[in-house]
Amino acid sequence: MHSDASNFQLNSHLSTLASIHKIYHTLHRLNLTEDVGPESHGTACCSRAMPPRKKRRPTAGDDLSAKKSRQDNVYRKQEALQIQEAEAFSSKRCLEWFYEYAGCDDVVGPEGMEKFCEDIGVEPENVVMLVLAWKLDAQSMGYFTLQEWLKGMGSLQCDSTEKLRNSLDYLRSVLNDATSFKLIYRYAFDFAREKDQRSLDLNTAKCMLGLLLGKTWPLFPVFNQFLEQSKYKVINKDQWCNVLEFSRTINLDLSNYDEDGAWPVLLDEFVEWYKDREMS
């Protein structure tokens, strides 16, 4: 009797397991179960039995860190904006800069010009000052008016000593362009002459020629000697412009100089003086 009861229980369990196995495979075919092995099922059961993990609540330290990060972003944006404003040209700043050197008559005169040159680290006789004056379209040597300053510095985008210092190399490079050099050379004549005179006095002419041609025209020292011993007291604009053309086109031995060409008498006399000097 006992044996029959045990067999009945065993058969009942086996039948139940077979039914469960059949149901599982049916669900599997219908994609209603995960394709996992027995071990995974055990893990899944365990995980379903475990309660879900709670999200960690932010602490006071987290709040401070987030606040500091936001503040840092604000500071970085403000700093970037300040840099942009400092780099951008400001007419107001340019005007304030002008009055560091100008007198009560709204003109930078000799004293202000001396301080200005000292601040930008350039000697007043440096050729870069001539280029700057040309950029400002200054009308009188040693003077910058308010209008010239604002217009010229605006074109250079300079509203401070530091910005102009950083632009000096650019101003020097302008002389390397033949067209710009010719414009500056012609400008220099009117810039340097007395406004009630049509010509340059000889001493001023020699200084300006030395500034513009002294380092690029090998014959300049000889030409300067010629001027010193000549009868000339002034140089007119036609003579001035032809000296530049002469320096650019005539060979150093003067072999291609045409005495019948349209050169001014000044240069005819220089060529004659030079040849006599070479022969003696």
Curated annotation (Swiss-Prot):
The keyword Transcription regulation does not apply. May interact (via the DCUN1 domain) with unneddylated cullins. This is DCN1-like protein 4. Pfam families: Cullin_binding. Keywords: Nucleus. Signal peptide: none annotated. The lineage of its organism: Eukaryota, Metazoa, Chordata, Craniata, Vertebrata. Its main location: nucleus.
